[in-house]
Amino acid sequence: MSITSRMDLPEEIQHPYAKFSEWKFKLFKVRPFQKEPSDKSQCINKDQEQEVASTDKNITLHKDEEVPRGEKLILTQKDFMGNTQALEKDVNDMKIQDNTAHQNNLKQLCRICGVSFKTDCYKRTHPVHGPVDDETLWLLRKKEKKATSWPDLIAKVFKIDVRGDVDTIHPTRFCHNCWSIIHRKFSNTPCEVYFPRNSTMEWQPHSANCEVCHTPSRGVKRKSQPPNVQHGKRVKIIAERARVNRGIKNQVIKNKNVMKEITNCKNRHLSTKLLAVDYPADFIKSISCQICEHILADPVETTCRHLFCRTCILSCIRVMGCYCPSCWYPCFPTDLVTPVKSFLNILDSLSIRCPVPECDEEILHGKYGQHFSNHKEMKDKELYNPINKGGRPRQHLLSLTRRAQKHRLRELKRQVKAFAEKEEGGDIKAVCMTLFLLALRAKNEHKQADELEAIMQGRGSGLHPAVCLAIRINTFLSCSQYHKMYRTVKAVTGRQIFQPLHALRTAEKALLPGYHPFEWKPPLKNVSTNTEVGIIDGLSGLPLSIDDYPIDTIAKRFRYDTALVSALKDMEEEILEGMKAKNLDDYLNGPFTVVVKECCDGMGDVSEKHGSGPAVPEKAVRFSFTVMNIAIDHENERIRIFEEVKPNSELCCKPLCLMLADESDHETLTAILSPLIAEREAMKNSELLLEIGGILRTFKFIFRGTGYDEKLVREVEGLEASGSTYICTLCDATRLEASQNLVFHSITRSHAENLERYEIWRSNPYHESVDELRDRVKGVSAKPFIETVPSIDALHCDIGNATEFYRIFQMEIGEVYKNPDATKEERKRWQLTLDKHLRKKMKLKPMMRMSGNFARKLMSKETVEAVCELIKCEERHEALKELMDLYLKMKPVWRSSCPAKECPELLCQYSYNSQRFAELLSTKFKYRYEGKITNYFHKTLAHVPEIIERDGSIGAWASEGNESGNKLFRRFRKMNARQSKFYEMEDVLKHHWLYTSKYLQKFMNAHKTLRSQGFAIDPDDGLGDSLPPEISLESNDSVEL
């Protein structure tokens, strides 16, 4: 019980010896040992004291009233308890009022600097929590800063964490002056702001001595001084000013001395007294540090344009706060910049006297470090006298053999090893390289020091390994050729510009399939869960027995799922940039839908004159895929975040399987591609879990087999060959029906229907004859094993139609419309006449087999004009020109990647043009198309609009990229020639995969851009003109060394 409460008790219930202590100390004049009531106990104001006094009066009973002792005690206790509770309630109410008043006072103070808002005449304040205002948000976006809330900015600028603030302790707003400081931090334009404190404001909970509540009322009265009548008013003012100025000057001198003690750089920096020339005082002040008054060493400039030594200003900022020591303008370490180069040149050209005793040499300030290090070396040499026990003169360390160097440095090596084990965990290499780096810096050999530092940090002084790998791949260098170039460049320049082969192999591992972990949900059926699978044999997993068909082939492939994973990881940046471009959050995990175009094509003769191994067919088949687009399902909408810009480029057509086999060999083709197709079918019903951008994301795949020519479509879909009566792979029309009805057909065939028809063909459930059964199944004669999309391959359509026009030209020259019964010799003569004329007029060289380039040049108005010179009839001229004109209007519709954007008018006119084209064929060229029509003419006239309406394009889904890949295959095979064809195929597959890597393409494009802009390696430092002329990175051919 407190003293106050004990004194307030009535006499009946007070302690019997309560008065004794007071009587005792009065008697002996001894001061009582009771503590004085604290400030908290004195917080009760006068109103409370009056209330307490009144309650005391009510509690005390009059002596005249007679009450029994027991009743008197009970009554006194009840009244005392009731009044005590009332007193406590009043105290609590007062505490609540005090806290409310405290919070109201806090609302008038700045959270950061503690200044009252009343000092600002505009009463401008800003909330501590919540998003920033529009002006600040615009500034942050302009400076590309990520922070968008006040707590982040306050923590960054003032190093104050306001996230844990309590409203009863901390103010909730800050002043406009602090707001200006934040703006100045993120803008380059200086503004006059002043931060009134050197340290952050510390806020305490409310108490009796609360500074927030009592500061305004606690004023210090000025001592009243009698007026001095002896002096006049002016004399008094002058004296006061002199006293103030003297105080300020003394304070400035004191501050400078404190700052000099903080920096303590007199042993490191050069004094201005060492200047060899008697420069003007103002000039000396401009080249000296404002803190230590020495010559500027590693000078830096503040925002307020004062100059300091870097170490001096950083030391002062660390101790005294973020202000300029000269003008106390806010200054942060990040604001320090190097002065202009012309000023540095002036500083380096100053002549100074060497401070070393017995050395009066005058040297330039810029070369003082090297001069001083020479003194230090001489001093060290004087202290160290090498022991030479006679014999031949002592040789320099670098001229010794490696064994002799080890012997001489044996003691030093032992000491370095002991230091490394004691201090650096045994890392001797790091200690030695750091010693070497410091030695280079001390000798001002900064160029070599930068190269060594780059090597220590893993960057290397030359090109990045990925750049070297991109150069090797894009210049078609084999490993041995690259290694020869690497050794030649290193020997000629003396530097390691290119990286060694082992660094390139490390870089390419991350780009090849089988490197990145992934998972399928549910797991793929009949596919291993092992993700570290690289190049595998195309025949692996194929059960063979003695009775099986013998397979004479060499096949190498990637597993389909690992190849897709590697392709997606290679496109990681494109995926994230696409999400950013569509304003999607980068943490969305999908599901992503990936649309894949599949291509397969056979190559002709790929024979080589070298290599050992089994006698395999000298024909090849390539299976490849292209990631066409990636979309994400977000808010019930499918948003496309990636779309291949050049879907027919060989740079995006990734190889999946290479085999030396004939595409006409159905058994071999089925044996090799069946495992691959099984993986494809398994992936259709599963989802891929792959980490993209550090977040696990979900991918689904849609496979579209569109990059097949007609021959291969018929092979894999089980249809009869191209000369069949059933001429179309999209509909069931026969050749006669197609010639009679040239335009009006629709797509009816599908992979599922072909499988059903094969079962009918195999089982013949209706016991029909061969002709009846063939008519029922519409030309299906084998089991389909690859699902293709019923479509037109634009490239082969172009080639097929050009071949047909080539024949029409010959027939028009021979006037077959008059004489249909021409002999074979006459037809051969027409062809020779046409070839000779095209060579002369169009520079078209005759070809045994028409290529895409020949078809493009042939199908032009100029060619028709040239051919018409060989035709006599003007009417035939008009018919032929109109036919070519209609074809050239129809061609862009199926050749363009997006006809709705690239040629919308021709797309609208396609139906009319195709009908007019069909009318010309059936009238003017009836001699050729009566009762028959070519396969591609039928597809061109009948199915193009329907396919475009379904897919949006025909050209984008063509096999042109795969055809370009065929050319690359031949080139890679010549380049990677090895003794074994097995390893040769692996090299070709690996090299071709890396050639299609978007990651390497970015490096190569950046490298070419730098070279084209003139940022090539300096001749004195790198390649330049010192390279032999036969080594050129711009060459497209293999380098012969």
Swiss-Prot record:
The organism's place on the tree of life at top rank: Eukaryota
Could you name the Gene Ontology cellular component terms for this entry? Answer: DNA recombinase complex; endodeoxyribonuclease complex; nucleus
Instruction: Please tell me whether the keyword Hydrolase is annotated for this protein.
Output: yes
Q: Where does Zn(2+) 1 bind?
A: 265, 269, 292, 294
Summarize which parts of the chain are annotated to bind DNA, as ranges.
Answer: 390-457
Cofactor(s) named in the record: Mg(2+); Mn(2+)
| Record-listed Zn(2+) 2 binding positions | 289, 292, 309, 312
Tell me which residue ranges form RAG1-type zinc fingers: 350-379
For biological process, the GO terms are: adaptive immune response; B cell differentiation; chromatin organization; T cell differentiation in thymus; V(D)J recombination
Q: Which positions are annotated as binding a divalent metal cation?
A: 601, 709, 963
Give the reaction(s) catalysed: S-ubiquitinyl-[E2 ubiquitin-conjugating enzyme]-L-cysteine + [acceptor protein]-L-lysine = [E2 ubiquitin-conjugating enzyme]-L-cysteine + N(6)-ubiquitinyl-[acceptor protein]-L-lysine
Locations listed in the record? Nucleus
Q: Which InterPro entries match?
A: RAG1, RAG1_imp-bd, RAG1_Znf, RAG_nonamer-bd_dom, Znf_C2H2_sf, Znf_C3HC4_RING-type, Znf_RING, Znf_RING/FYVE/PHD
User: What Pfam families does its record include?
Assistant: RAG1, RAG1_imp_bd, zf-C3HC4, zf-RAG1
Reported EC number(s) for this entry are: 3.1.-.-, 2.3.2.27
What residue intervals correspond to the zinc fingers (RING-type)?
289-328
User: What is the role of this chain?
Assistant: Catalytic component of the RAG complex, a multiprotein complex that mediates the DNA cleavage phase during V(D)J recombination. V(D)J recombination assembles a diverse repertoire of immunoglobulin and T-cell receptor genes in developing B and T lymphocytes through rearrangement of different V (variable), in some cases D (diversity), and J (joining) gene segments. In the RAG complex, RAG1 mediates the DNA-binding to the conserved recombination signal sequences (RSS) and catalyzes the DNA cleavage activities by introducing a double-strand break between the RSS and the adjacent coding segment.
Q: What is known of its domains?
A: The RING-type zinc finger mediates the E3 ubiquitin-protein ligase activity.
Assembly, per entry: Homodimer. Component of the RAG complex composed of core components RAG1 and RAG2.
What family is it from? Belongs to the RAG1 family.
This one is known as V(D)J recombination-activating protein 1
